[in-house]
């Protein structure tokens, strides 16, 4: 009976949903389907190409640059747990009741406002050989620590990670602050009456109630670190030195526009799409489990 009732409701709303579904299908489904199709061909920019089956995927799996790019994406994903942990600490300090907390919150959020390209250009100067960071180290007598942060293979990807992390923290603090504002203050008052410290109250009372927003921040961060890092890499390092900062997104760009290998670039795009969908699906599964817990 419930099934028939659900079908009846679906039949009533279908005419209203149809235009939106059709638009989404045209804007999203059709391009995705074409990319998947191209990934099974040896298509180039100027030639339609022939069906080659899984050859492109096999070539990727055997390419050392693909694995290096994937490793770099995983390194950039460290920005997710780090930004969440730092944002939790900052949010706890701000809501401790320090004077001027709103001003500090605004200042922390400011790095998120400029475009990624603007942030990357700023750090291109800050992390340069003669930039403020190295000058500060030299002025402090730590000349041995001064280096080309973006021009040495051993430090370049970690420097990019630092820039990504610096930009993400402000947004994450904003999310957590909004959730904190909706938590019943009587819970904190009751804990204070029981003699609990603010730190203990925050981590044992507030943080558990922020699980949903933490999960949202994690999913968004993972997808960003996996698929939205192109601007950081292309401005800060252009994939160098010696391709040490290639990411999957930058590899896709080079395959598509420099090498004209549309089929191989499409295979990279499909891999990235599947990875993003897997993360999102895992989060949805956790959310459902929490809802029925």
Give the location of each predicted region.
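Short, Lys/Arg-rich, polar N-terminal cytosolic tail immediately upstream
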Residues: 1-9
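A structural signal for multi-pass alpha-helical bundles of membrane permease subunits
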Residues: 9-293
């Amino acid at each position: 009976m419930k099934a028939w009732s659900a079908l009846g409701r679906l039949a009533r709303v279908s005419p209203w949903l149809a235009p939106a579904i059709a638009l989404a299908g045209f804007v999203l489904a059709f391009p995705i389907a074409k990319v998947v199709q191209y990934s099974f061909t040896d298509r180039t920019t100027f030639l339609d190409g022939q069906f080659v089956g899984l050859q492109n995927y096999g070539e990727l799996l055997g390419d050392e640059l693909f694995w290096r790019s994937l490793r770099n994406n995983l390194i950039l994903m460290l920005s997710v747990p780090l930004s969440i942990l730092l944002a939790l600490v900052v949010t706890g300090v701000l809501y401790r009741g320090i004077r001027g907390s709103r001003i500090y919150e605004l200042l922390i959020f400011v790095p998120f406002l400029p475009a990624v390209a603007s942030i990357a250009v700023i750090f291109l100067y800050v992390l340069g050989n003669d930039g403020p960071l190295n000058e500060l180290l030299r002025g402090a007598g730590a000349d041995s620590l001064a280096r080309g942060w973006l021009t040495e293979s051993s430090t370049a990807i970690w420097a990019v990670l630092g820039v990504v992390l610096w930009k993400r923290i402000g947004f994450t603090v904003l999310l957590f602050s909004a959730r904190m504002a909706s938590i019943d203050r009587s819970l904190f008052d009751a804990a204070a009456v029981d003699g609990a410290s603010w730190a203990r109250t925050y981590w044992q009372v507030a943080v558990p109630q922020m699980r949903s927003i933490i999960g949202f921040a994690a999913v968004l961060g993972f997808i960003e670190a996996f698929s939205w890092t192109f601007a950081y890499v292309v401005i800060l390092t252009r994939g160098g030195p010696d391709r040490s900062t290639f990411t999957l997104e930058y590899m896709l760009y080079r395959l598509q526009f420099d090498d004209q290998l549309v089929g191989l670039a499409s295979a990279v795009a499909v891999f990235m799409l599947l990875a993003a969908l897997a993360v999102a699906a895992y989060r949805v599964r956790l959310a459902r489990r929490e809802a029925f817990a």
